[in-house]
Amino acid sequence: MTIDPRHKSHNLLDGPGRAPARAMLKAVGFTDADLERPLIGVANTWIEVMPCNFHLRRLSERVKAGIRAAGGTPIEYNTIAVSDGISMGTEGMKASLISREVIADSIELVARGHLFDGVVALSGCDKTIPGTVMALCRLNVPSLMIYGGSIMPGQFQGHDVTIQDVFEAVGKHAAGTMTNAELKDLEDHACPGPGACGGQFTANTMAIAFEFLGISPMGRNGVPAMDARKDDVAFECGKLVMDLLKKDIRPKQIITRRSIENAIAAVATTGGSTNAVLHLLAVAREMGVRLSIDDFDKINRKVPLLADLKPGGRFTAADLYAAGGTTLVAKRLIDAKILHPDQITVTGRTIGEEAKAATEKPDQQVLRPLSKPIKPTGGLVILKGNLAPEGCVVKVAGHSILHFSGPAKVYEREEDAFKAVQAGKIKAGDVVVIRYEGPSGGPGMREMLGVTAAIVGAGLGDSVALLTDGRFSGATHGLMAGHVAPEAIKGGPIAAVKTGDIITFDITKRRLDVNVTQKELAARLKKVKHPSPRYLSGVMGKYARHVSSASEGAVT
């Protein structure tokens, strides 16, 4: 493929006046022939601090080979990544959600600065997936995202295990039901190699969502990280971006209100992570699509929960792939007349056309038939009430609690709540409240997996509820309300809750309330003394000053 005047790189490379640019590119190995072809950015999120992204260098080489085979010149560059699983429960976790914005900004800046004609983004860990797609939305050049794939399950005492089991084992160990030796054995075997966390946690949730959004080729993200076919997928994606360039298909033609609704439906039917609400709101904003937190509840009301996936179910993402994968999920939802089948994807085919290729493993138990759903409605609900005027998100996949009332145990930060659980201070019937962990108040809206897993590990998963203006990991299960908005630091009612107040979750009525009058809440809020900002400078301080509410996607 020769340079077409439509291609941005024409302005970077052509003519005598661009000799300095060509000279610098030749210094790193590019030839005249290379520079006559379209330049395709390969935005990698490789990092060696975690298994999720550790193998992406291998995949990027195959992506680049595919680009070359189709007549393009790949230029690889890297951005940052922060491991949720490693930083969980520490001050470091505050960097996680903030990294989504930095990932998007950095991918965008490099691509704009070097006038790339197209981009392939490689992602793995939680925030790299939405971060890469947000960048592609902004750039609006022919582009796609490829997910590195799920880790395979580990083995412990004859059972499949994931990182979720290790977090919950910490609670069991504290409760005295797991020995030091057992914890060490589990630690050593839970994560057998590269790939993202294995359940329907945030990474796999967003990988599926973005196939249904159309920005990743259907059925390809689900190929596990160490499956030999993943290299073929990467090569195919390299060729595919050149096809998108030839046809001039761009994200704005793919990502629409209807494709976002398809993505929400995919999250709903697979029991996906609450983080999908934040990330899809953010993507919608990048594309100028009107989307509210209430839209998630409307769609979840009409979508059946079909996938029996961890953390609330029995199976892993690798099991779903073996059962038939996302094309089978798409077929189920099209048969139910839930999806918009006419939405185009990066393959150039519609999601309806992709679903026609679905196959199903005989006797598979991972994805239920429409006639026998796990639940008649989806895995997420949005609650509002005097504690969450702008809303909050509850994951109902994996539990059947529809009503819960109990006295509040209030903590100003995650670490204090974790210590209380470890010390046995949380009892059956309690409602744990963790505040000042929101987007601005944290800052960074930490995930509370350390606390929620400790609660489950202590045997209190069905008898204790939790609410926070922070987030939850996709590995969280039990009655947990996150993203409570407005957040405490912005004067949200959660700041006025006192230990002993009775808090009620009513899933059926979609309500979250504290048994205090509006007059009393208002009086309390006037007397609240918010903690001083924890960060005044650097990226944390800047984020705290500019980030929006969780109900708007926590964007900057």
Language-model segment annotations:
Residues M1-F54, L59-I80, G85-I86, E91-S96, ...:
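Catalytic or ion-coupling anion/metal-binding cores of large enzyme and transporter domains
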Residues A111-T132, L144-Y147:
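A short, small-residue-rich loop immediately preceding and capping a beta-strand
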Residues S96-D105:
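Glycine-rich, highly charged phosphate/nucleotide-binding loops
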